[in-house]
């Protein structure tokens, strides 16, 4: 979908963000692809105070040792990973990138500059998704080591959603 001209791609992290994304998509001109996972995820946004803006990521945790950049249901997994790393003395910055296209280049470049390494996490094929978009951005503007976590390039299987990840 990223290769389609003018396409907006949104992958919300929780119910509050999903509702806001649907409202924003309704107001947009042009095609929008809203990607929702099958699994129930914890709600961590406060609906009363949450502001959704297409193309603007969200920093969820402080940290300069590594940046974990996630989308969709993997945002909550990234938050849990940051807690695990903190217990080991590693301070991870977690970014919620709900809009894969257009990509929030500023927040990603800032994280790359300040952290020096990035892990991307998505419940999507590593080809054509968030990780590839970030690798493309960084290769041109700020070469930074990136490790992509996602579905490898193979045909899908059927089964319980967590087992498939």
Where do the PLM segments sit?
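Charged, amphipathic alpha-helical interaction segments
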Residues: 23, 30, 83-87
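Thiamine diphosphate
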Residues: 37-165
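Conserved thiamine diphosphate
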Residues: 1-27
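Glycine- and acidic-residue-enriched helix-capping/beta->alpha junction motif
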Residues: 24-31, 134-137
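Divalent-metal (often Zn2+) His-rich catalytic cores of metallo-beta-lactamase-fold enzymes
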Residues: 34
